[in-house]
Amino acid sequence: MSKSSDRINLTNQFLIAMPNMADPTFSGTVVYLCDHSERGALGLVINRPTDIDLESLFNRIDLKLEIEPLLHIPVYFGGPVQTERGFVLHEPVEGSSYNSSMTVEGGLEMTTSKDVLEAVATGTGPKRFLLTLGHAGWGAGQLEEEISKNGWLTVAADPRIVFDTPAEERFEAALGLLGVSSSMLSGEAGHA
């Protein structure tokens, strides 16, 4: 392995699953990488809505959500790790600090504490957010290995895809950042 100073940091990038993705958990997914270091990586799948909406989830955790446009926003499957835990990917809120937030270098924030949901419920929280149950995680070197085996494409993340693009269009929209579409991809790795 090269020196750590030569390492590529994929924080604030999208991982786009290649057609040959063997793991059905990640087939067809776009993952927003919140953290990538020599210790591993943590990300949130942004294009797998569940059957649970915000109203249902808030009721389960005894929060009253009365903001009509938010009631039926879906909760997403964020990945197979800690699926009972909520992860909120959101734009920074000026003047706010939540109990358990991580600022993604050059990008968004990820918060895991209930106070961000309380702020959303009262209309004082982030206006643009995506709530997931669970996250995706990779151990040291694991993600790099998957990328080297043609499992993922990477591209700089665009918050408009996370927050403004319908879930079913996010995969193609992320590929579009690279100037390609899924019809152009092959599951076979090649060498020129």
From Swiss-Prot:
This is UPF0301 protein BTH_I1462. Gene3D superfamilies: VC0467-like. One of its GO terms (cellular component) is cytosol. InterPro entries: AlgH-like (IPR003774). It comes from Burkholderia thailandensis (strain ATCC 700388 / DSM 13276 / CCUG 48851 / CIP 106301 / E264). The lineage of its organism: Bacteria, Pseudomonadati, Pseudomonadota, Betaproteobacteria, Burkholderiales. Belongs to the UPF0301 (AlgH) family. It comes from the Bacteria.
